[in-house]
């Protein structure tokens, strides 16, 4: 075709240095008479080092001897509907390339989603079949006998005699096309391993309270002190007795009394809860100073701060009193026996309330 040489790369003689006085048209490597000036222009561009970018040309026009740029030419090509041999070959090539581009785009999307992966080699397939056969999977009925041959590299399926003498054919790429089957037994673990990380909350109305081990303290009602009223039927106290540490509570020889009256729920101010050096308030009784008769005097401030820090405003009347105090003997009959266990357990508080005298 005469026009191909006009737009092709200049030949070896044209790349030689130009002799002085020689015309630029003489540097064309070949071509027709009408394209000599164009080839000479391309030769001078090659010598000067400034090559113009190659513009795509219409393939149908090139097949029929014309060179026309492809930009804006597709709708106006004279051989757009040509059915000659060369144009049919071009149309077939365009369809194949479009199908390859679509397939490549689909594979890229599936790899991003983790749906598909490349088909393994026959050696990997044989290893997977042997592993599944050793694990006793009934899906692949392959016996390791002398008559069974390993699958050849060209065929993707394996044939082995079954127990009844029939041939069982399994397609290996179909088995391995759903995720990484050979790595599945190593990656899947027991669900109980993950369930141990997430513990259900003991208190469904609070997000921060979980069943952490608490002090070994169990509180139960003691009926040996006389007249005991009816216990309150329902759930135990929302906030457990978190104020007193465990070593001091079983150290008391007497019973621990709980004063919780619905009429005497005083909200202790923040200064008595934050600062332990303030004296006890007068409205809580004169015998409040007897609470802090513990064995160790170093824990006085801790016990005093914990005694004056109720868990909430509803339980602000919950005060721990020794059995020798007159308030405990006269005004309340709720007896709570403090027992210490060797292992941590939750508090079980069962308050018993009798009306004020």
UniProtKB/Swiss-Prot annotation:
GO terms for molecular function: cis-regulatory region sequence-specific DNA binding; DNA-binding transcription factor activity, RNA polymerase II-specific; metal ion binding; RNA polymerase II cis-regulatory region sequence-specific DNA binding. Coiled coil: none annotated. Residues 38-50 have a biased composition (Low complexity). Residues 58-105 bind DNA. It is found in: Nucleus. Keywords: Activator, Developmental protein, Differentiation, DNA-binding, Metal-binding, Nucleus, Phosphoprotein, Repressor, Sexual differentiation, Transcription, Transcription regulation, Tumor suppressor, Zinc. GO terms for cellular component: nucleus. The modification Phosphoserine is found at residue 323. Transcription factor that plays a key role in male sex determination and differentiation by controlling testis development and male germ cell proliferation. Plays a central role in spermatogonia by inhibiting meiosis in undifferentiated spermatogonia and promoting mitosis, leading to spermatogonial development and allowing abundant and continuous production of sperm. Belongs to the DMRT family. This is Doublesex and mab-3 related transcription factor 1. The lineage of its organism: Eukaryota, Metazoa, Chordata, Craniata, Vertebrata. The gene is DMRT1.
């Amino acid at each position: 075709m005469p026009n191909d040489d006009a737009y092709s790369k200049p030949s070896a003689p044209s790349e030689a240095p130009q002799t002085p006085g020689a015309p630029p048209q003489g540097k064309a490597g070949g071509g027709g008479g009408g394209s000599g000036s164009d080839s000479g222009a391309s030769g001078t561009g090659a010598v000067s080092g400034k090559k113009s970018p190659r513009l795509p040309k219409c393939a149908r026009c090139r097949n029929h001897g014309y060179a026309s740029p492809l930009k804006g030419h597709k709708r106006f090509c004279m051989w757009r509907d040509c059915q000659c041999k060369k144009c049919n070959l071009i149309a077939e090539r365009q369809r194949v390339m479009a199908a390859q581009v679509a397939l490549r785009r689909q594979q890229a999307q599936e790899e991003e989603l983790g749906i598909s992966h490349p088909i393994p080699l026959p050696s990997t397939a044989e290893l997977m079949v042997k592993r599944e056969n050793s694990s006793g999977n009934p899906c692949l009925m392959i016996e390791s006998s002398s008559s069974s041959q390993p699958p050849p590299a060209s065929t993707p399926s394996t044939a082995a005699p079954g127990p009844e003498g029939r041939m069982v054919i399994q397609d290996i790429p179909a088995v391995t096309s759903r995720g990484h089957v050979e790595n599945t037994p190593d990656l899947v673990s027991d669900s109980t391993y993950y369930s141990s990380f997430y513990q259900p909350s003991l208190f469904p109305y609070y997000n921060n309270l979980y069943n952490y081990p608490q002090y070994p303290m169990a509180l139960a009602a003691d009926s040996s002190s006389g007249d005991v009223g009816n216990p309150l039927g329902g759930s135990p106290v929302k906030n457990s007795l978190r104020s007193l540490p465990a070593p001091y509570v079983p150290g008391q020889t007497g019973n621990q009394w709980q004063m919780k009256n619905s009429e005497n729920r005083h909200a202790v101010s923040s200064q008595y809860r934050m600062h332990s050096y303030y004296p006890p308030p007068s409205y809580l009784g004169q015998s409040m100073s007897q609470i802090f008769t513990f064995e160790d005097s170093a824990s006085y401030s801790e016990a005093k701060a914990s005694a004056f820090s109720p868990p909430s405003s509803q339980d602000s009347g919950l005060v721990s009193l020794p059995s020798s105090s007159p308030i405990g003997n006269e005004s309340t009959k709720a007896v709570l026996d403090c027992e210490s266990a060797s292992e941590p357990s939750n508090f079980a508080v069962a308050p018993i309330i009798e009306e004020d005298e």
